[in-house]
A protein has these predicted regions:
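Extracellular loop-to-transmembrane helix junctions
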Residues: 22, 45-150, 259-262, 269, ...
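Loop-to-transmembrane helix boundary motifs in multi-pass membrane proteins
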Residues: 22, 27, 156-162, 246-250, ...
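Membrane-interface "cap" regions at the ends of multi-pass membrane proteins
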Residues: 1-46, 52-57, 70-74, 83-86, ...
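C-terminal membrane-solvent junction of multi-pass transporters and transport-like membrane proteins
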Residues: 21, 153-157, 168, 215, ...
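Membrane-helix boundary/coupling elements in multi-pass transport proteins
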Residues: 44, 108-123, 227, 232, ...
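Hydrophobic alpha-helical segments of multi-pass membrane transport proteins
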Residues: 130, 193-197, 329, 379-406, ...
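Helix-loop-helix junctions that connect adjacent transmembrane segments
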Residues: 14-21, 58-59, 63, 137-163, ...
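Membrane-interface loop-to-helix entry segments
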Residues: 125, 156-204, 215-217, 256-257, ...
Length: 467
């Protein structure tokens, strides 16, 4: 049995066309879907972490992270327009690079989606607590954060993060999916909050706070960029909607690139305002840096709106990431790479009920017990590895299937995909040794599962659907 057996691209596309899903999404819907998935903990919470690490040069860190993401986004856009099939990077790699690589990427995606849902839950917790304090409700300190996450403060369990994660799991398990209209409304709220920060904050910027601009040198800038990469994760969620798009070959690339571009501009501007209002070193240990900056500026009413907007806006990110995790698990189980029980559908709710609850409970415990900075780095290394693979896959599919119609072509192949791989690997090298060790352990576990179970049980081995 070949480790590189592939799914047939033509059969995949034909199967997607027979699926009968309602094709209702356009370019604007996809752009909003992307922005909805991107804007979350990265900007509302990790801005403080990045500011401590890079200083005012956090603006440069965002640009570096955006370039790395943008190069990968071009590769994503080509795949999304060529193979408009649900499943995103896992499906693309199964067609272009073969089963073993698809397994590794799927295993990486499971890490990305589950930890991203947990990380956003932690971010949500910080803003929810800040909002509750405005109404005089204060939780016991030991239940406000994961152990060792707040310097000098004894904490054991992040209760709000656990509760919100379980609430989202309950909704998903009974089949409540966010509609495009609700998602667009939440995106509007999040973008409005970010614009409010910029509009009010710009009048309270003290240029002296931008000096020194790069207090920790380029190592601080690149280290922060490796963490802030998390702020852009989510544009890949656009491609998972491929089978429900009216004109996927045109609209998917627009949705991917437009959502990333809008968020990059907003992030750099917010970083400039936040580090201009508060000296970057003062963000250490702050779990709600954006509203904190406005509180320092004396704009408590604006800070309250930011807390509310962040709480509402991050709910959609938790939902999208948790749903994405259940979808990738379901797809891999359906392909035979994971046990069939994980793709079993509830007879009443028509959802992968057991898989949703297993994933939800694990994510809730992770959110309650692991500090945010640790989660962010682990998410980033898995995602950067997966993005590198999709860039390589573009080059491979160009050579192996030059006949496939490509509505969008990644420019400068193979140079641009090679640059994307180089940028992703460079950011990976700026992550901590502990993160690399944890990622290595995760990969080893995944490979053991593949060789012991998945390789023998893969549906493709039974059906011989190779190209």
């Amino acid at each position: 049995m070949s480790l590189l057996r592939k799914k047939n691209v033509d059969q995949m596309i034909a199967g997607a066309q027979r699926a009968g899903l309602k094709k209702a999404l356009g370019a604007v819907d996809l752009t909003f879907l992307g922005i909805g998935a991107i804007i979350g903990t990265g900007i509302f919470v990790l801005t403080g972490t990045g500011a401590v690490q890079a200083g005012p040069a956090l603006m440069v860190s965002f640009i570096v992270a955006a370039i790395a993401c943008g190069l990968s986004a071009l590769a994503y856009a080509e795949f999304a327009s060529t193979i408009p099939v649900a499943g995103s990077i896992y499906t693309y790699s199964y067609a272009a690079l073969g089963e073993l690589v698809a397994w590794i990427i799927g295993w990486d995606l499971m890490l990305e989606y589950s930890l991203a849902a947990s990380a956003v839950s932690v971010g949500w917790s910080g803003y929810a607590q800040s909002l509750l304090k405005g109404f005089g409700v204060v939780l016991p300190t030991v239940l406000t954060a994961a152990p060792n996450s707040v310097p000098g403060v004894t904490t054991y369990f992040d209760l709000p993060a656990f509760v919100v994660m379980m609430a989202i799991t309950t909704l998903l398990s009974v089949g409540i999916r966010e509609s495009t209209r609700v998602n667009n409304l939440m995106v509007f709220i999040k973008v409005a909050v970010v614009l409010l920060v910029i509009a009010v904050g710009v009048f309270h910027v003290t240029p002296a706070n931008w000096t020194p601009f790069m207090p920790h040198g380029w190592s601080g800038v690149f280290g922060a960029a490796a963490v802030m990469f998390f702020a852009f994760i989510g544009f890949d969620a656009v491609s998972s909607a491929a089978e429900e798009v009216k004109n996927p070959k045109r609209d998917l690339p627009i949705g991917i690139i437009a959502s990333l571009g809008v968020c990059a501009v907003l992030y750099v501007t917010v970083a400039a305002v936040a580090t201009g209002i508060v000296p970057s070193s003062q963000y250490a240990g702050i779990t709600h840096p954006i509203s904190y900056a406005l509180q320092v500026a004396g704009q408590n009413w604006v800070a309250g709106f930011i807390d509310l907007g962040a709480v509402l806006g991050m709910l959609t990110v938790i939902l999208v990431m948790t749903y994405g995790q259940t979808r990738i698990t379901y797809a891999m189980s359906r392909d035979g790479l994971l046990p069939a029980v994980l793709s079993r559908v509830h007879p009443r709710f028509q959802t992968p009920f057991l898989a949703t609850w297993i994933i939800g409970l694990l994510c809730a415990l992770i959110a309650a017990l692991i500090p945010l900075n640790v989660l962010a780095e682990l998410i980033n290394i898995g995602t950067l590895a997966a993005f590198s693979m999709v860039s390589i896959a573009v080059i491979v599919l160009r050579r192996t299937r030059p006949d496939l119609p490509r509505a969008f072509r990644c420019p400068g192949v193979p140079v641009v995909p090679v640059l994307a791989v180089a940028a992703c690997v460079f950011l990976m090298l700026n992550l901590s040794a502990v993160t690399w060790k944890a990622f290595g352990i995760w990969l080893v576990i995944g490979l053991v599962i593949y060789f012991v179970y998945s390789r023998r049980n893969a549906k493709i081995a039974q059906g011989g659907a190779q190209h």
